[in-house]
Curated annotation (Swiss-Prot):
Protein name from the UniProt record: Elongation factor P
InterPro entries: Elong-fact-P_C (IPR015365), NA-bd_OB-fold (IPR012340), Rib_uL2_dom2 (IPR014722), Transl_elong_fac_P/YeiP (IPR020599), Transl_elong_KOW-like (IPR013185), Transl_elong_P/YeiP_cen (IPR001059), Transl_elong_P/YeiP_CS (IPR013852), Transl_elongation_fac_P (IPR011768)
Processing after translation: May be beta-lysylated on the epsilon-amino group of Lys-34 by the combined action of EpmA and EpmB, and then hydroxylated on the C5 position of the same residue by EpmC (if this protein is present). Lysylation is critical for the stimulatory effect of EF-P on peptide-bond formation. The lysylation moiety may extend toward the peptidyltransferase center and stabilize the terminal 3-CCA end of the tRNA. Hydroxylation of the C5 position on Lys-34 may allow additional potential stabilizing hydrogen-bond interactions with the P-tRNA.
Gene: efp
Entry's family note: Belongs to the elongation factor P family.
């Protein structure tokens, strides 16, 4: 199995720590005036999304995680798990609701998602940065009603709720940023 030295650490690198796959979020090289240099690293656990901070002595090695990212298409929900299919090999991946996490509110049939596999098992799903979804319920915007924030809540076809401008109506399709859960624009047909 491959390993990484501390001088190869950078954001996005996937490593194995105590048997858990982790991704490096932040890496800071520290060279004190006295003593050995070290790396202060923030790591995000890919299994439970917890962020931990660890320090590694300069020159130390860490095992690479057997993590694979695949582009897949969301197919359907079979009652227990969500089924994603690889578009070229047609291989299906069953993903539990726990592994899906917050991405569940952005699931739309036939959209592409990144499936993260650890030892061949799906452990998490990454939604695209932007999705186009239909508004199924929102209050009508009243003309001149801008005393508040200038926005209103809207329920989308997936069940997610986002704040939208007053001019947006039920039945319209909007573009949403999945990273921040915010309205971006209306989608023209």
């Amino acid at each position: 199995m491959a390993s990484y030295s501390t001088n190869e650490f950078k954001g996005g690198l996937k490593v194995l720590i105590d048997g858990n796959p982790m991704v490096i979020v932040e890496n800071e090289f520290v060279k004190p005036g006295k003593g050995q240099a070290f790396n202060r690293v923030k790591l995000k656990n890919l299994l439970n999304d917890r962020v931990v901070e660890k320090t590694f002595k300069s020159g130390e090695s860490v095992e690479a995680a057997d993590v694979e990212e695949l582009t897949t298409v969301y197919s359907y929900f079979d009652g227990d798990s969500y089924v994603f299919m690889h578009p070229e090999t047609f291989e299906q991946y069953m993903v539990s609701e726990e592994a899906l996490g917050e991405t569940k509110k952005w699931l739309k049939d036939q959209d592409e998602y990144q499936v993260i596999l650890f030892n061949g098992q799906p452990i998490s799903i990454i939604a695209p940065n932007f999705v186009n979804l239909e508004i199924i319920e929102t209050d009508p915007g009243l003309k001149g009603d801008t005393a508040g924030t200038g926005g209103k809540p809207a329920t989308l076809s997936t069940g997610a709720v986002v704040r939208v401008p007053l001019f947006v109506q039920t039945g319209e399709i909007i573009k949403v940023d999945t990273r921040t859960s915010t309205y971006v624009s209306r989608v023209k047909d």
